[in-house]
A protein has these predicted regions:
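Short helix-loop "hinge" at the ATP-lid/N-box region of the Bergerat-fold HATPase_c
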Residues: 123-124
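Short flexible loop/turn segments at helix-to-beta-strand junctions
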Residues: 62-71, 75-76, 106, 128
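Conserved glycine-rich
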Residues: 197-199
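Conserved catalytic submotifs in the C-terminal HATPase_c
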Residues: 69-70, 89, 94-104
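Short alpha-helical segment of the dimerization/phosphotransfer core of two-component systems
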Residues: 42-47
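Short conserved segment of the HATPase_c
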Residues: 156-170
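Short acidic helix/loop segment immediately C-terminal to the autophosphorylated histidine
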Residues: 23-30
């Protein structure tokens, strides 16, 4: 938990320093003030996500699993795209998606949101430094909802693939420190998916470039959707 503790302290320290700078600087120009406030917002969002992941981890470990119900993937994806849009734009990453209307999973809205947010945020972090993209697709295959999240980033070495869903595991620790993270996101995604009777796998992207995560969730039946 030391990694998680450190990650909690980092945004808190940033918020405090930025706030102190604003309060202690007389006649700070509006543009600088706006930049500082924007940075405070980013750090607050980062802190919120870390806290949310830790709380979800506690619930999963405690066996607290809310009842599942039909969740359309499309609207959740649109919401996550809006939330991550600014982060992606700042990195020059283009997010695109193609979702079948039939992609209705038997889970909870929070489940699907957590899965998409963690996978897409991760893909944006590790996307290519130039002309980066993140592609999300959702369809129905073999009686399951299949979601794929693909990026054109640095990819995951073959020796790391069996371990990426392990708790607190981070591929290339030097690179991980640059982009941040606790090493909990993928573990939480896996536990969430398996808690709904689904599965997740990871592999190389098209032509061996980047990474593709494939999620399989139970399909909500028509009577469940009614």
């Amino acid at each position: 938990m030391s990694d998680a503790s450190h990650e909690l302290k980092t945004p808190l320290a940033g918020i405090r320093l930025l706030t102190d700078s604003i309060l202690q600087t007389d006649n700070m120009d509006p543009e600088t003030t706006k930049e500082f406030v924007t940075d405070i917002g980013r750090e607050a969002e980062r802190l919120s996500r870390i806290t949310e992941n830790l709380l979800r981890l506690t619930r999963l470990d405690g066996g607290v699993v809310p009842s599942a119900y039909p969740v359309a993937v499309g609207p959740v994806l649109q919401r996550v795209e809006r939330m991550l849009g600014m982060v992606a734009a700042e990195k020059g990453v283009v997010i695109s998606g193609a979702v079948s209307e039939d992609a209705v999973a038997l889970a909870t809205d929070d489940d699907v949101h957590q899965i998409l947010y963690n996978l897409m945020e991760n893909a944006i972090k590790y996307s290519a430094p130039e002309n980066g993209f993140v592609r999300v697709e959702a369809s129905v295959q073999d009686g399951q909802v299949v979601i794929t999240v693909t990026d054109n980033g640095i990819g995951i070495p073959d020796e790391d693939l069996p371990h990426i869903f392990d708790r607190f595991y981070r591929v290339d620790k030097m690179r991980s420190r640059e982009v941040g993270g606790t090493g909990l996101g993928l573990s939480i995604v896996k536990d969430t998916i398996e808690g709904r009777g689904g599965a997740i796998s990871a592999g190389h992207g098209p032509d061996g470039v980047g990474t593709t995560f494939t999620v399989r969730l139970p399909l909500a039946q028509r009577e469940e959707e009614a």
